[in-house]
Amino acid sequence: MEGLTRVPVREQEPEVRAANFEEVCLGYNEEEAVAEAKRCLNCKNAQCMKGCPVSINIPAFIAQVKEGNFEEAYHIISESSALPAVCGRVCPQESQCEGKCIRGIKGEPVAIGKLERFVADWAREHGIKPKKAEKLNGHKVAVIGSGPAGLTCAGDLAKLGYDVTIFEALHEAGGVLIYGIPEFRLPKSKVVAAEVENVKALGVKIETNVVIGKAVTIDELMEEEGFEAVFIGSGAGLPRFMGIPGEQAMGVFSANEFLTRNNLMKAFRDDYDTPIKAGKKVVVVGGGNVAMDAARTAKRLGAEVHIVYRRGEEELPARKEEVHHAKEEGIIFDLLQNPTEILVDEDGWVKGCRVIKMELGEPDASGRRSPVEIPGSEYEIEADTVIMSLGTSPNPLISSTTKGLDINRRKCIIAEEETGATSKDGVYAGGDAVTGAATVILAMGAGKTAAKGIDEFLRNK
């Protein structure tokens, strides 16, 4: 039956890409994009839109792609999304828009993410920019953090005529998009920098190297700098560890540090002096997308890489596409296993891991079956580098320097889901700073929600 399978997307061959940092997925060309768009049934009650956290008008943009009207398709997408070239690459479409596509009932869903990426890339290559607000409305808003939540909130507010300034702690804008996601999944200069420039083209100002809570506080921004509202999108950058013996050894990294050195500080390039030690044999602890990113990065730096995860393959939280790519590239999965100790040599360097085998017991609070240790099953894995990918928490610097800002026991800022409003008047928050580490698109959705909340707040002030 015609249209059951999607147009294949071109990729680098596994044996080639495992030795370079070029983008794995090569995307659609114009002919392929039009052919894939023609698979869309243009449903009147489009379920795909219900799966999109930023509410892109998916049938409308795909209808324009069908006709070859790529510029119009871009403007439809950019009405809702500030980062389409990013989302088309890293969003978990399989559980969101594509997961609700009617085509998926009797075949493969329409490749919505790949079409979004194509449109955004086409627009960038042809110099097409999002439409700017005609005039300012006289209100100043500060945005803390230039990650997906901050960029989205700032972009949406700028479109409504607000005078928006983003304050970024690092020397480069992009947040987790530049320090957390590898080049082979999300090119920095070609894609992320261009998306940031598009947000700036809307009139948003970005000040880098400004640590809010240290250089200036939120109270000072509002009381002395004239900002009438503040959005906190500072992310969750503090890594978690297991608390097992040997974690302080040299050769133990958090995935956050390992990826930041490579992605932001370009440790993988010979013309940069950023120190990194991938070693010959790397153990990555964890099973999420960040673990896959760390493992695939270490592989490209020449190491044999093992992913050690305490549950089975069905329970891996990483996207299936990322797991598939990791396996293709030769990453070894040691599943239903968990480290109990990091082994250290006499000089203080990692020499291996002691690991215990696990089995799945009863479901835990998340609905997943709890891993249970199998007594007497411990053994040792040789390794000279261990990368811990166990999630991250928000940095308490902002919350500890802002009077009246409530946080929960996990140090996450408490914000209303419907508006992004916090306990402090005029201060809004969203993304990982509120939820803990989550996806790019969920952070964008939170930034979008907060922009609406801020707009309503200032209109009624």
Regions found by a protein language model. Give the residues of each.
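A conserved FAD-binding loop/helix module that cradles the flavin
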Residues: 433-459
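Feature captures the FAD/FMN-dependent oxidoreductase FAD-binding
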Residues: 72, 135-136, 140-144, 196-244, ...
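Glycine-rich dinucleotide-binding loop and its adjacent helix/turn
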Residues: 119-135, 194-211, 239-301, 408-418, ...
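N-terminal Rossmann-like FAD-binding beta1-loop-alpha1 element of flavoenzymes
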Residues: 139-165, 291-299
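Rossmann-like dinucleotide-binding cores of NAD(P)H-dependent redox enzymes
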Residues: 163-166, 170-201, 206-207, 295-341
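Iron-sulfur cluster-binding cysteine motifs and their immediate structural context
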Residues: 42-67, 86-119, 165, 172, ...
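FAD-site-proximal beta/loop scaffold in flavoenzymes
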Residues: 248-279, 363-437
